[in-house]
């Protein structure tokens, strides 16, 4: 959620920036009308409160003099009723302003390139050279099925399309990837491993910005019947990413600035309805309703967040480098950024069967957009005032897509897969996966 003070002090500039950079039309007249109404009610409430306090003091003085105070009491009571009505009206207007703010995306950082979609993203760098094959390249589906390790038909039978069953050595390779990522981030990058719930409540999804705007992208549990007195009446939602529960660990907290930055990592399943993705990436593991990801989250002081974004992105890059997977780093343009992001880098891994780079990690600096929703603050020693923290998140990496990249980049002419060296300790020393 953007800072309400920006709308009070720089409404036209903010509206123009949102239009130019985000393609978002802010209803300026509604904002102005609500703000004028809020100001008037704020003044009225404060005036009535002051007058009521003064009258109350007069009652005490009159009572001490032995005077009849019934008229004064009635006056104070009436004023109290008027004050309560003004407070209710003020709360209602503030709620309307808040509701309006919830639909407004974050303002991009100045260095983010203008653009309408992913075709206008800016390539920053490349690492590694795509392998030149001397045989016909197979995609990960053909490779995985031939190795009896990927069973998409079983996924459909058990649930529906966009689900898969992994078996045998490929299931172990998938597990090895997640363990390798966690070990790297905790042992070399300074992250604290967390094990978080996969079901979360409304407040948690609101805090990181999934609700109210992106509810259709989530899987929600059905409201409970209420017939069992032991049931809770609150439905939950499956997490679309570990960013949601992990970032919310600091919700409603005041953090000692000396303890910043906080770095957390978690390996979780992720669940997405993929609303609006009908017909896209229907083959294979690229776009699933359920997939696993190792997430990185950082909570930092505001002045450190841009530096932290470079660091966090570098941590995701290190995974790809150690796996020997060619990739490119892309700075997203304004039209391709997430709703709450101020700046985002995507890492795109080379997939030989598609002869292109595909997203495998997205690393974002959210500034104080999430922190304002979560009331996540920090305070320096000796300071009376708190300030909002900045939050960052990034995939380190999406495990299923990393498996895709390993299968395709490390395939051999006979359909076997060479296990990357860094994964062999997690595979019991296995060097090559065969059928």
Curated annotation (Swiss-Prot):
Gene Ontology MF term list: ATP binding; serine-tRNA ligase activity
Main location per the UniProt record: cytoplasm
Residues annotated as transmembrane: none
Superkingdom of the source species: Bacteria
Enzyme class: ligase
Keywords: Aminoacyl-tRNA synthetase, ATP-binding, Cytoplasm, Ligase, Nucleotide-binding, Protein biosynthesis
SUPFAM superfamilies: Class II aaRS and biotin synthetases, tRNA-binding arm
Pathway: Aminoacyl-tRNA biosynthesis; selenocysteinyl-tRNA(Sec) biosynthesis; L-seryl-tRNA(Sec) from L-serine and tRNA(Sec): step 1/1
UniProt-annotated binding residues for ATP: 272-274, 359-362
GO CC annotations, alphabetized: cytoplasm
Keyword Protein biosynthesis: yes
InterPro entries: aa-tRNA-synt_IIb (IPR002314), aa-tRNA-synth_II (IPR006195), aa-tRNA-synth_II/BPL/LPL (IPR045864), Ser-tRNA-ligase_type_1 (IPR002317), Ser-tRNA-synth_1_N (IPR015866), SerRS_1_N_sf (IPR042103), SerRS_core (IPR033729), tRNA-bd_arm (IPR010978)
Protein family according to the UniProt entry: Belongs to the class-II aminoacyl-tRNA synthetase family. Type-1 seryl-tRNA synthetase subfamily.
NCBIfam families named among the record's database cross-references: serS
Complex formation: Homodimer. The tRNA molecule binds across the dimer.
Comment block on domains: Consists of two distinct domains, a catalytic core and a N-terminal extension that is involved in tRNA binding.
Name of protein: Serine--tRNA ligase
Primary gene name: serS
């Amino acid at each position: 959620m953007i800072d309400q003070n920006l709308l009070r002090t720089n409404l036209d500039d903010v509206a123009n920036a949102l239009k130019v950079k985000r393609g978002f039309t802010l209803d300026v007249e509604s904002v102005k009308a609500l703000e004028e109404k809020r100001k008037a009610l704020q003044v009225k409430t404060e005036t009535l409160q002051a007058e009521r306090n003064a009258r109350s003091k007069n009652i005490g003085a009159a009572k001490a003099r032995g005077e009849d105070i019934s008229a004064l009491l009635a006056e104070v009571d009436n004023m109290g009723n008027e004050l309560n009505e003004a407070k209710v009206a003020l709360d209602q207007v503030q709620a309307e302003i808040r509701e309006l703010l919830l639909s407004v995306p974050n303002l991009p950082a100045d260095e983010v390139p203008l653009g309408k979609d992913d075709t206008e993203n800016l390539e920053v760098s490349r690492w590694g050279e795509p392998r030149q094959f001397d045989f016909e390249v197979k995609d990960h589906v053909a490779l995985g099925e031939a190795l009896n390790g990927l069973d998409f038909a079983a996924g459909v039978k058990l649930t529906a399309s966009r689900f898969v069953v992994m078996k045998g050595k490929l299931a172990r390779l998938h597990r090895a990837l997640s363990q390798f990522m966690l070990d790297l981030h905790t042992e070399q990058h300074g992250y604290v491993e967390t094990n978080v719930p996969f079901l979360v409540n409304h407040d948690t999804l609101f805090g990181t910005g999934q609700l109210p705007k992106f509810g259709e992208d989530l899987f929600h549990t059905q409201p409970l019947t209420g017939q069992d007195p032991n049931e809770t009446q609150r439905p939950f939602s499956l997490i679309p990413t570990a960013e949601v529960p992990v970032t919310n660990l600091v919700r409603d907290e005041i953090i000692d600035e000396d303890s910043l930055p906080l770095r957390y990592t978690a390996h979780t399943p992720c669940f997405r309805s993929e609303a609006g993705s009908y017909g896209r990436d229907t083959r294979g593991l690229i776009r699933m309703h359920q997939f696993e990801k190792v997430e990185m989250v950082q909570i930092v002081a505001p002045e450190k967040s841009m530096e932290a974004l470079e660091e966090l992105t570098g941590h995701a890059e290190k995974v790809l480098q150690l796996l020997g997977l060619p990739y490119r780093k892309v700075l997203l343009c304004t039209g391709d950024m997430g709703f709450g992001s101020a700046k985002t880098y995507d890492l795109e891994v080379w997939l030989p069967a598609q002869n292109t780079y595909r997203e495998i990690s997205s690393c974002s600096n959210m500034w104080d957009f999430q922190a304002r929703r979560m009331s996540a603050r920090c305070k320096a020693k000796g300071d009376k005032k708190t300030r909002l923290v900045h939050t960052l998140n990034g995939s380190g990496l999406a495990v299923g897509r990393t498996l895709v990249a390993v299968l395709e980049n490390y395939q051999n002419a006979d359909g076997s897969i060479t296990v990357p060296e860094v994964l062999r300790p997690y595979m019991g020393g296995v060097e090559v996966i065969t059928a």
